[in-house]
Amino acid sequence: IIDNPEITLEANPDDLSEEKIVQLAASSINRLSIGIQSFFEEDLKLMNRAHNAAEAEKSLQLARQHFDNISIDLIYGMPNMSLARWKENIDKALGYGIPHISSYALTVEPKTALAKFVEKGLVSPASDEEAQEHFNLLNETLLDAGFDCYETSNFGKPGYYSKNNSAYWQQKKYIGIGPSAHSFDGVRRGWNINNNPKYIKSIEQE
């Protein structure tokens, strides 16, 4: 293992109680990646997220007290998301002093609640043009705030680029721990099963 490795924990806002964050800060974990996705209740409900808008903000308030290196995920291209509301999402993140943001266009996955809404005509996915406008606004706003777009979907302030994200493009080795986590040994890529109980059972058997 290299000296001073980046050890990132990925979590959702509803996973991060104050007690849990204090425990994480006392461990070897030195980077938090939080799946905020949106600061708006209607977006979170549409994506069927387990957390609400209040929990999203609370998790960042707590995380900032104990971690310096924090990344959040934000989703753009949401149905009915205006540029103004998307800008509010970005501004909220910047207001918390987050040094790294990963942002992805919404993908409507089969058999999800959102897919059913689309099938029934209750919502319409954003057009490619609308999603592009969202990304352009994100890129412009974050560059003005001192971020660099160092990888397609990742923006970081100098010194806060994700070593893990950079490793993908540089073909470096990395280890993923946990359900669905991917690893690369320099030759082959592999990934763990995505079922939590089965993953835990497999560890206990080893």
Question: Where are these predicted regions, by residue range?
Answer:
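C-terminal scaffold of the Radical SAM
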Residues: I1-E206
